[in-house]
Amino acid sequence: MAKQVFQTTFAGRELIVETGQVAKQANGSVVVRYGESTVLTAAVMSKKMATGDFFPLQVNYEEKMYAAGKFPGGFMKREGRPSTDATLTARLIDRPIRPMFAEGFRNEVQVINTVLSYDENASAPMAAMFGSSLALSISDIPFDGPIAGVQVGYVDGQIIINPSQEQAEQSLLELTVAGTKHAINMVESGAKELSEEIMLEALLKGHEAVKELIAFQEEIVAAVGKEKAEVELLHVDAELQAEIIAAYNSDLQKAVQVEEKLAREAATQAVKDQVTAVYEEKYANHEEFDRIMRDVAEILEQMEHAEVRRLITEDKVRPDGRKVDEIRPLDAVVDFLPRVHGSGLFTRGQTQALSVLTLAPMGETQIIDGLDPEYKKRFMHHYNFPQYSVGETGRYGAPGRREIGHGALGERALAQVLPSLEEFPYAIRLVAEVLESNGSSSQASICAGTLALMAGGVPIKAPVAGIAMGLISDGNNYTVLTDIQGLEDHFGDMDFKVAGTRDGITALQMDIKIQGITAEILTEALAQAKKARFEILDVIEATIPEVRPELAPTAPKIDTIKIDVDKIKIVIGKGGETIDKIIAETGVKIDIDEEGNVSIYSSDQDAINRAKEIIAGLVREAKVDEVYRAKVVRIEKFGAFVNLFDKTDALVHISEMAWTRTNRVEDLVEIGDEVDVKVIKIDEKGRIDASMKALLPRPPKPEHDEKGEKSERPHRPRHHKDHKPKKEFTETPKDSE
């Protein structure tokens, strides 16, 4: 296929798509140029159905540092594992694409996005999402798209699509919305306490922009799209399905309605084990034994799925007996742990999260060096999900994509209420340990995080709570569920997480298993979530009504001083010698930013005070008319040099030592003497002149003799070579005439 180019303008920037030139052996590939961001997307599919009971879709977003004209960090100077931002972007693309494959599709699919050039004002992640959908759509892979996504900002009361870097920094909203031309199917957002009405408006306007991108994709697919391949879908034997349903459906219905999670799981597993044993014996010698037993497992899963959904939509009964808008029992505890800087334990039904706060000097901030300019990340929220939380064994190691994503969601929700750096100059880390899970653990971690921050004395603007909403839809009717548990999440159509304060929303995340949801469903879900959020906030505020006025005794204390930027090098010293000496002498930690803000941290206030004194002395400047208790450090014929403070010396000229004439400096002072002096002059080179006599009482004026002349010869001070006197001009008799 020859190279073809398609072009349009979107959100004020040129959008160009190229096909048929590169990566031609992939099932589908495109180069997307948006502004000056360039992304290559290639989609490939395996020839055969993969084993396993899930769809093996892999989406990668690869940031190449050359795209921004940068070297990778580290010793190897080569890209390694994906950054957190790259992982989150890959998840962002995966989520709206995954529902667009047919039920039973099991071929492995990989969608690889490579950022080739990067323009911070033209969203590369959105170009990658566009490219992922388009590469799948023009390929022979059976993808029921296209989809598209946009970023949405809110600046000065205006909704902005794909905001620039400058607009994004001013925006009260950071929203990504994706969907088909018919409905929204993915949402990810952080917001500065915006109302449900503004969030809904942003979602709907974002979807209108999505439709523009989909229309452009459809134009390209019509021109270059391939015919879709015929692939085998996973189907179960219809006769076998009918046989099992007739014999065992009533047993499974009873098991599903057991209210307690572990007991319900045991009851349903007992039914499945019974059915499995029967058919293992029945077909033990059958040549298609493996296929039959795979079908048995799939049929039992479908039966449980259908019964949970029937209970909710028809009987209006949830598996644990709650109403559709009812929250599970809540409990909140602070100070669960001693010694740490703050802790909170939050329990909702059988979901429980422990959040632990750690405060540290700003030197502990995380340095983020990706495609954007390097910056320091002050707040971190990490989420851990051990397998024991669901009573299972499993893999332990580095956090996976799910843990990274849930941590980022909690981070967005809580970051909106944190104090500014000026108000609270600490690096802040929250770690959420999920101790039990039966759905909505990410939202429990947000609630526990609020408790830990308040207990730790972090002056947040307001408490934040989170709730997960669900959806059961049969195409014509739907039911929105409040506070979904694991079974409802697994068999439901939507997981819609909403976090916020009493004043507004701080984070949203929505994933669905159907191809989209309507504005009506969104409106209802947001309204139910608000009601539930307020109920949870009632419990949090009853546990800890306000932020504690002081930090924990184990938390580092902090004091800050401001110094001139040109004094930073004095405090640091050659090779860090001076600052290292201060740290060694006092035991504190010191951070200095490029604006001259010096932060001193220690659990010992006396150590902080000592370090402050040393630094203040290093950057102290003498001022004219100020008086100092100085020490004589050197004597010359023309005067004495005195130390005012630290490394700052001044000259007291012999003429400034006393009101009477003195021939020898040694007659008045000796090395080591302490004298009071007043600074009388600082020249442009910083040389300081001081005076002792300025602090002494002036002697009375001498009496005049009969001829009108002074009885004593006037004093004329001597001057040394470093202090040349200014020329003085006096009037001569000729001039006066």
Swiss-Prot record:
Catalytic reaction equation(s): RNA(n+1) + phosphate = RNA(n) + a ribonucleoside 5'-diphosphate
GO molecular function, one term: RNA binding
InterPro entries (alphabetical): ExoRNase_PH_dom1 (IPR001247), ExoRNase_PH_dom2 (IPR015847), ExoRNase_PH_dom2_sf (IPR036345), KH_dom (IPR004087), KH_dom_type_1 (IPR004088), KH_dom_type_1_sf (IPR036612), NA-bd_OB-fold (IPR012340), PNPase (IPR012162)
Principal subcellular localization: cytoplasm
UniProt feature, compositional bias: Basic and acidic residues: 700-714, 725-737
PROSITE patterns registered for this protein in UniProt: KH_TYPE_1, S1
Known EC number: 2.7.7.8
Residues in KH domain copies: 556-615
Keyword Metal-binding: yes
Cofactor or coenzyme needed: Mg(2+)
Biased composition (Basic residues): 715-724
Gene Ontology CC: cytosol
Domain spans labelled S1 motif: 625-693
Keyword Magnesium: yes
Gene Ontology annotations of biological process type: mRNA catabolic process; RNA processing
Localisation per UniProt entry: Cytoplasm
Sequence segments annotated as region (Disordered): 691-737
Keyword line: Cytoplasm, Magnesium, Metal-binding, Nucleotidyltransferase, RNA-binding, Transferase
Pfam families the UniProt entry points to: KH_1 (PF00013), PNPase (PF03726), RNase_PH (PF01138), RNase_PH_C (PF03725), S1 (PF00575)
Binding site for Mg(2+): D489, D495
Family: Belongs to the polyribonucleotide nucleotidyltransferase family.
Function statement: Involved in mRNA degradation. Catalyzes the phosphorolysis of single-stranded polyribonucleotides processively in the 3'- to 5'-direction.
This protein's name: Polyribonucleotide nucleotidyltransferase
Lineage: Bacteria, Bacillati, Bacillota, Bacilli, Lactobacillales
